[in-house]
Amino acid sequence: MTMEPERNRIYRMDCMELFSQIPDGYVSMILTDPPYGIRYQNNFARCPHPPIAGDSGIDYEQFARESYRILRNDSHAYFFTRFDCYPYHYNCLKEAGFSIKNCLVVEKGTVGGIGDLQGSYANNAEWLIFCQKGRRTFNHTPLLQNRKKEGTRPRPGANPSKRYKTRFNACWFGTEYPKATYNSVWQKKHRIYHPTIKNAEFLSWLIQISSQPGELIFDGFMGSGSTAVAAMMAGRDYLGAEIDPAYCDMAVKRASEFRKEALISGPVTE
């Protein structure tokens, strides 16, 4: 009999291997940035880094099917993507059974880009495919405050405005939204370098919108551990894998340090 994986743990292994240990409907939300097969490598933040292990591509069709299997009914899933990978990823997720609701476009913390930057537009946004297994409504959160004073009626007979917004746009740009990634100044200050590092505050917003406290958030490609930190920020548990030993060590250390600072108990191990 296969043992269930531990909550609040980052496993040093391939995501597909971890899938084989996870029962059906075990996780409450998926939030992940799977490899696109582009072997991303640059001198980001003036800290050259090696190619990402496993970034030569995955069997995305199998990945989509397994993601659907382990996700609880009536739950949300977010998959980062790129403009040139989006059609294929969309089709794989749809074939796996997901109901695809939106493609979110979120401003980066710094303008990125490689290749012909004199003949193409610099990439200043992250794309995420937002899916549902069944149907789950968004939580009412205190993340975005309405500009209008609470109780204001825009017209006679209309419902009074609430203090916090209950709907979110598909494009997150501007000062009221957190950026999708950390900029190079943050990376150098914290000595956390990863070519596709995500902003934990931004991820925590998605987690607060799409899950309840104590629920389990899954990320099969933990990278530097932003999803684990974001889950703890929001009072949720996490589970994930990272195949690259160096990044796995970084993720485990980062999660441990956050838990220590926040005085949150629970195991964080490889």
PLM regions with names:
Residues 12-17, 268:
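Conserved SAM/SAH-binding loop
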Residues 56-111:
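Conserved Class I SAM-dependent methyltransferase catalytic core
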Residues 25-76, 234:
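SAM-dependent methyltransferase catalytic-core segment centered on the flexible catalytic loop
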Residues 2-10:
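Beta-strand-turn-beta hairpins that frame and shape the catalytic cleft
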Residues 18-24:
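Short conserved loop adjoining the S-adenosyl-L-methionine
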Residues 24, 31, 40-41, 47, ...:
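Class I S-adenosyl-L-methionine
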Residues 18, 84-89, 230, 250:
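Phosphate- and divalent-cation-binding pockets in alpha/beta enzyme and binding domains
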Residues 10-13, 50-61, 193-201:
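Conserved phosphate-coordination/catalytic loops
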